[in-house]
From Swiss-Prot:
Name of one Pfam family that matches: Trigger_N
Family according to the record: Belongs to the FKBP-type PPIase family. Tig subfamily.
GO cellular component terms listed in the entry, alphabetical order: cytoplasm
Domain of life assignment: Bacteria
Function recorded in the entry: Involved in protein export. Acts as a chaperone by maintaining the newly synthesized protein in an open conformation. Functions as a peptidyl-prolyl cis-trans isomerase.
Domain PPIase FKBP-type: 163-248
Catalytic activity of the protein: [protein]-peptidylproline (omega=180) = [protein]-peptidylproline (omega=0)
Protein name: Trigger factor
Length: 436
């Protein structure tokens, strides 16, 4: 008789399972005999130990495995018969009341996958982003590269300005008491690079070598130094040196320093434009994809299995702890990481994954081999030996599958854009590149 699966609430289901004690014991005895052929028991030759002795040493473990196997088989038969897709693993609870002596009974509580309905794509409002790359962006990037290669020349009597390198001594106190990290001598930094807190840089602006200043500085509440975060310190700084940054000319020597072997400035600019366009394209794709995925999630109204959300949360917590270890954070395994910090994003990821999977199936989308190859070749252009990178990905099925997943996601985005209400939006270059 097929077990009856009971609907509890939402995606939760329950089913009663039963296995025969006789069937359990029959399988236990069979496995004990198999183990007995090779088991080494003190005082007996291999294969000659009495079954009763094997029962004492191996019986409990074998019986546990057999019961798990038979109950698992009964569960699979029950959900297959009900044509259900189980999300996660069931929770098994032994039953004792009203159960025959020759039967082991359990209640399995579990979740099922939801019926996912892909929203009407024509009703979705999404944004497609664009950023033109002109000579202005190329020249702006050239200026950044020049500043990175600036040579600093000491200027006597110069009041410090943005872009200057200053060398100074500083000492800070909180309530009159020095604190760790609050004092340094001959400390160099470039004004305007954002290396120091804004109030600190502002205090150093306009000072000449030999001049000092006393000023208050409030540390941000989220400052990395927890012992001073949110507190106000009093700093004294004394400037010892002001050096002006002298930018290199954009000439053959400069081009060669950036890897343009021939020293051709125009070819350098062309290379810079190509690199900018590649980076801009990747960032625009990311923004547009974000708009598409946000629209899908917003329109996808269905319950998601808690088991899948919990699994995603566990994975993200494990990844976060691993990142802390890589950064050398002590006791990373004991750092508090409440599940609720991750649960909202995990639920979104699970919902989006179910939606995208159903959309791929309905629209019969796939990552075509030529698309995968093109994406690998495009990705390889970021490396000095692109041909080796292409071979690296094509030679390994798992690595190739990573690119296939990216291409398939791109095809999902393209499919939605073909069918949705699309608004085109220009993004300023500085904003796109995080320079604004």
């Amino acid at each position: 008789m097929q077990p009856v699966v009971e609907t509890l609430s939402g995606l939760e289901r329950r089913v009663d399972l039963a296995v025969s004690v006789a069937e359990v014991e029959k399988e236990v005895q069979a496995q004990l005999k198999r183990v007995g052929r090779t088991a080494k028991v003190a005082g007996f030759r291999p294969g000659k130990a009495p079954l009763a002795m094997l029962e004492r040493s191996h019986g409990p473990g074998i019986r546990y495995d057999v019961i798990n196997s038979l109950v698992g088989r009964a569960f699979e038969q029950a959900v297959d018969g009900a044509k259900l897709r189980v999300a996660g693993s069931p929770t098994l609870t032994p039953k004792t009341e009203g159960v025959a002596e020759d039967t082991l009974a359990f209640t399995a509580t579990f979740e099922v996958y939801p019926e996912v309905t892909v929203p009407d794509l024509s009703a979705l409002a999404v944004t497609r982003y664009d950023t033109p790359v002109t000579d202005a962006e190329v020249n702006q990037t050239l200026d950044v590269l020049r500043k990175q290669r600036a040579k600093f020349e000491i200027r006597e009597g110069r009041a410090s300005q943005d872009g200057d390198r200053v060398v100074l001594d500083f000492a800070g106190t909180i309530d009159g008491v020095p604190f760790e990290g609050g004092k340094a001598e001959d400390f160099p930094f470039v004004l305007g690079q954002g290396r120091m807190l804004p109030e600190f840089e502002e205090a150093a602006l306009g000072l000449k070598a030999g001049e000092s200043k006393v000023f208050p500085l409030k540390f941000p509440d989220d400052y990395q130094g927890k012992e001073v975060a949110g507190k106000t310190a009093e700093f004294t700084i004394t400037v010892k040196e002001v050096a002006e940054g002298v930018l290199p000319e954009v000439d053959a020597e400069f081009a060669k320093s950036l890897g343009q072997a021939e020293g051709d400035v125009e070819k350098l600019k062309a290379d810079i434009r190509t690199n900018i366009e590649r980076e801009v394209k990747a960032r625009l794709q990311g923004r547009t994809k974000g708009s598409v995925m946000d629209a899908l999630v917003e329109a996808g109204k269905f319950d998601v299995p808690k088991a899948l959300v919990d699994s995603d949360v566990e994975g993200r917590i494990a990844a976060a702890r691993e990142e802390l270890k890589q950064r050398g954070v002590p006791n990373a395994d004991s750092v508090p990481m409440p599940a609720e910090v991750f649960s909202t994003e995990s639920e979104r990821r699970v919902r989006l994954g179910l939606l995208v999977s159903e959309l791929v199936k309905q629209a019969q989308l796939q990552a075509k081999p030529e698309q995968v190859r093109a994406r690998i070749e495009e990705f390889a252009q970021n490396y000095e030996q692109p041909a080796q990178v292409v071979s690296y990905y094509l030679a390994d099925r798992q690595r190739r599958a990573e690119i296939e997943a990216i291409v398939l996601e791109d095809n999902v985005v393209a499919h939605v854009l073909e069918n949705a209400k699309v608004a085109d939006e220009k993004v300023p270059f500085d904003q796109l590149m995080g320079m604004a």
